[in-house]
Regions:
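Radical SAM enzyme [4Fe-4S]-AdoMet core and its adjacent flexible, acidic
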Residues: 1-5, 55-58, 102, 120-284, ...
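Short loop/turn hinge sites at secondary-structure boundaries
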Residues: 13-23, 171, 288, 299-300
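Processing junctions and N-termini across compartments
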Residues: 30, 34-37, 239, 301-304
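Local cysteine-cluster metal-coordination motifs and their immediate loop/turn environment
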Residues: 37-45, 262-265, 304-313
Length: 314
């Protein structure tokens, strides 16, 4: 199954999942860290609306084992932060893959810290998928939007090339992918030229719309002349209807401090549906507050819920 097929399967709400009491999701993203070394203008993380720390290793092990026992099959070792900042990332991959038996363990990175030896360790631990978020046309734009030194742009490209070399030399089964934000006009043309540089080194490249991050960064995007898609409607070539939002039904999101969130962009904690340090994953997944939110989504009216502020529902 390709990465886009997996994404489309998760962003499509199967009839059996379209209920207030929903089956345990097939996929969960768990946040090893809330930290990131970038300060991207299109991401609300840099607004620092919550504490940004690393997950306790013991809590990680507890939750990952519990979720696998509950029936979760696909585990993303990231959420809102950059997981390559965590020293024990390869150990986390090994624990999920080898000790807990997840069929599919995946990771998304900005690429700057995905150094060859770190990537090698993750692949040897059993990583199934490594995706690079590649959103900039050149070093100048990269520095302006990501808020970091321009030299990292070339470093990211070098890391992508190295990842392909390591995978091929050691015959790992890890898929290598890249996503980019889909722009139109001149920026769109520039992005395609930039993507051509990395295209030989990845298995698949796909586009994502520019998100408003639960309407937290829409002002910044408007100021820069960017046109954002509200909510999380999946990838650009297979946009989903904004209501009901798939994230409420098909994929779990666990923060570094053990909160279960209903949103892909929970930068301020308003979408917390349960505390996994106090209750089980299956229990929190169908908590009363989560059930109530799902009913609103199924009814097509999220006014009065935590989701009403998202521009998708205005």
């Amino acid at each position: 199954m390709t990465i886009t097929e997996r994404i489309d399967a998760i962003t499509s709400i199967e009839p059996l999942r379209a209920h207030a009491i929903a089956p345990v999701p097939r996929a969960v993203k768990i946040e090893l860290t809330g930290r990131c070394n970038f300060a991207c203008a299109f991401c609300a993380r840099d607004m620092r609306l919550r504490d940004q720390k690393d997950m306790d290793k013991g809590l990680f092990r507890q939750l990952v084992r519990e979720m696998r026992g509950a029936g979760v099959e696909e585990l993303g070792l990231f959420y809102l932060g950059e997981s390559f900042m965590v020293p024990w990332l390869p150990e986390a991959v090994a624990y999920a893959k080898q000790d807990c038996g997840y069929p599919y363990v995946f990771l998304t990175t900005n690429g700057s810290l995905a150094l060859p030896e770190r990537v090698r360790a993750c692949m040897r631990a059993g990583l199934d998928s490594l995706k690079f978020s590649y959103n900039f046309a050149d070093a100048e734009q990269f520095s302006d939007v990501a808020g970091v030194k321009p030299r990292y742009f070339e470093a990211i490209k070098a890391n992508i090339r190295a990842a392909r070399r390591i995978r091929d030399e050691e015959n790992h089964a890890c898929g290598l992918y890249a996503s980019y934000i889909e722009y139109d006009g001149v920026q769109g043309e520039r992005m395609q030229q930039a993507l051509d540089e990395i295209r030989p080194y990845v298995d698949e490249i796909y586009a994502l719309p520019l998100y408003s991050q639960a309407d937290l960064v829409s002002g910044e995007e408007d100021m820069r002349g960017w046109s954002a898609v509200a909510g999380n409607r999946g990838r650009a070539a297979a946009l989903r209807d904004p209501l009901p939002c798939w994230a409420v039904f098909t994929e779990g999101h666990v923060t570094w401090d053990g909160k279960l969130s209903a949103c892909c962009f929970d930068h301020d904690g308003r979408f917390h549906m349960g505390d996994l340090t106090r209750e089980g994953f299956a229990e929190a997944w169908n908590s009363e507050i989560f059930q109530s939110l799902r009913r609103a989504h199924l009814a097509g009216d999220v006014s009065g819920t935590v989701c009403e502020g998202c521009a998708a529902y205005r």
